[in-house]
């Protein structure tokens, strides 16, 4: 799990206004942090297939949110992709 301090930092970095915890950018950033954490977990636990299922679910959720953001607000999408270092 992501530490509370790390969550607060991610929320403050991607929030659109004070107290914003549910915007699309914040949700994508939190899911991305969890995905990166799971990838580190898999480096030592190669046969943890149950967690791999959860990882695939998170990747799908992030993709859906990214598609939504791209469809609704392209500039915010491009900025987020660049900040998170997702697509090349």
Swiss-Prot record:
Complex formation: Part of the 30S ribosomal subunit. Forms a bridge to the 50S subunit in the 70S ribosome, contacting the 23S rRNA.
InterPro entries in UniProt: Ribosomal_uS15, Ribosomal_uS15_bac-type, uS15_NS1_RNA-bd_sf
SMART domains hit by this protein: Ribosomal_S15
Keyword line: Ribonucleoprotein, Ribosomal protein, RNA-binding, rRNA-binding
Sections of the chain in a coiled coil: none
Gene: rpsO
Keyword Ribosomal protein: yes
Identification of the protein by name: Small ribosomal subunit protein uS15
Role description: One of the primary rRNA binding proteins, it binds directly to 16S rRNA where it helps nucleate assembly of the platform of the 30S subunit by binding and bridging several RNA helices of the 16S rRNA. Forms an intersubunit bridge (bridge B4) with the 23S rRNA of the 50S subunit in the ribosome.
GO cellular component: cytosolic small ribosomal subunit
A GO BP entry: translation
Record-annotated membrane-spanning stretches: none
Family label: Belongs to the universal ribosomal protein uS15 family.
């Amino acid at each position: 799990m992501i530490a509370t301090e790390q969550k607060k930092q991610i929320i403050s970095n991607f929030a659109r206004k004070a107290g914003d915890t549910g915007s699309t950018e914040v949700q994508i950033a939190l899911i991305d942090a969890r995905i990166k954490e799971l990838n580190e977990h898999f480096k030592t636990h190669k046969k943890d297939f149950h967690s791999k299922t959860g990882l695939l679910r998170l990747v799908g959720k992030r993709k859906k949110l990214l598609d939504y953001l791209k469809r609704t607000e392209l500039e915010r999408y491009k900025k987020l992709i660049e900040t998170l270092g997702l697509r090349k």
